[in-house]
């Protein structure tokens, strides 16, 4: 109905190849791949930083809790 058929898609791909050339498209594809790889790496690095920060905060809270328990025992 309103969708793109296979033949229309092939015609569009052929026109794009004729306009830009295969070398330019290959370069564009590799640049796009490197961009995606860099984005994924940045996301992974961000998650590692957040995990380290969370661990640091949880260690601090455990230390504070132990200190408060010790103070409560001394007061009792």
From Swiss-Prot:
UniProt-annotated stretches for the region Disordered: 45-76
Organism: Pasteurella multocida (strain Pm70)
Function: Part of the twin-arginine translocation (Tat) system that transports large folded proteins containing a characteristic twin-arginine motif in their signal peptide across membranes. TatA could form the protein-conducting channel of the Tat system.
Transmembrane segments: 1-21
Similarity comment text for this entry: Belongs to the TatA/E family.
Gene name tied to this protein: tatA
Membrane topology: Single-pass membrane protein
Subcellular location(s) of the protein: Cell inner membrane
Lineage summary: Bacteria, Pseudomonadati, Pseudomonadota, Gammaproteobacteria, Pasteurellales
Gene3D superfamilies from the UniProt entry: 1.20.5.3310
Oligomer status and interactors: The Tat system comprises two distinct complexes: a TatABC complex, containing multiple copies of TatA, TatB and TatC subunits, and a separate TatA complex, containing only TatA subunits. Substrates initially bind to the TatABC complex, which probably triggers association of the separate TatA complex to form the active translocon.
Any one Gene Ontology cellular component term annotated for this protein: TAT protein transport complex
Entries under Pfam families matching the protein: TatA_B_E
Example GO BP: protein transport by the Tat complex
Predominant localisation class: membrane
Keyword entries, A-Z: Cell inner membrane, Cell membrane, Membrane, Protein transport, Translocation, Transmembrane, Transmembrane helix, Transport
Entry protein name: Sec-independent protein translocase protein TatA
GO molecular function, one term: protein transmembrane transporter activity
């Amino acid at each position: 109905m309103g969708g793109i058929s296979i033949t229309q898609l092939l015609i569009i791909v052929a026109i794009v190849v004729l306009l830009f050339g295969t070398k330019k498209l290959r370069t564009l594809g590799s640049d796009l791949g490197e961009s995606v790889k860099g984005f994924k790496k940045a996301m992974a690095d961000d998650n590692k930083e957040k995990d380290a920060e969370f661990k640091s905060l949880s260690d601090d809270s455990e230390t504070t809790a132990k200190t408060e328990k010790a103070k409560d025992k001394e007061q009792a």
